[in-house]
Amino acid sequence: MAKAPIRARKRVKKQVSDGVAHIHASFNNTIVTITDRQGNALGWATAGGSGFRGSRKSTPFAAQVAAERCAEAVKEYGIKNLEVVVKGPGPGRESTVRALNAAGFRITNITDVTPIPHNGCRPPKKRRV
C-alpha cells in the first residue's frame, strides 16, 4: 500500500519595509549583507561568490554585481528603504551603494563604521613592486 506523500507547508516570507545593508569592503573582496532592523540576515552576496576570482574579485564592478545579486535575493521581502552601513577601505565602497540605489531601494542614510585604530597593531609592510 503506497503512502500519500507528505507535503511540507510553504514558508511565508515575512514582509519587511525597512532594512540595513551592511557592506564590508576589504582590499581583496566585498561582502554585502541585507538585514532587517533587528539585525536578522535576509540575504547576502560576495564578489567572490558572484563568479569573480583572483584580482578581479577586488574591483568595483565585482562589488556592483554582488550588490545586485544581494538586492535580487531580498526582493521577496518587500524592502523599500535601506540604511547603508559601510565598513572597510576597499574599492567596492561607492559602487555598491550606487548599485543598491539603482536596484530600486530608497537609501535613507549612509554610515561609515570603518574601524580606526588608536595606534593599535602594526600595519603590514609597504609593497615593493
Swiss-Prot record:
Pfam annotation, one family: Ribosomal_S11
Protein name: Small ribosomal subunit protein uS11
Task performed by this protein: Located on the platform of the 30S subunit, it bridges several disparate RNA helices of the 16S rRNA. Forms part of the Shine-Dalgarno cleft in the 70S ribosome.
Keyword Metal-binding recorded: no
Taxonomic lineage from the root: Bacteria, Pseudomonadati, Pseudomonadota, Gammaproteobacteria, Enterobacterales
PANTHER family per record: 40S RIBOSOMAL PROTEIN S14/30S RIBOSOMAL PROTEIN S11
Top-level taxon in the UniProt lineage: Bacteria
GO biological process: translation
Organism: Sodalis glossinidius (strain morsitans)
Keyword RNA-binding: yes
Subunit record text: Part of the 30S ribosomal subunit. Interacts with proteins S7 and S18. Binds to IF-3.
Stated family: Belongs to the universal ribosomal protein uS11 family.
GO molecular-function terms, A-Z: rRNA binding; structural constituent of ribosome
Keywords on record: Ribonucleoprotein, Ribosomal protein, RNA-binding, rRNA-binding
One CC-aspect GO term: ribosome
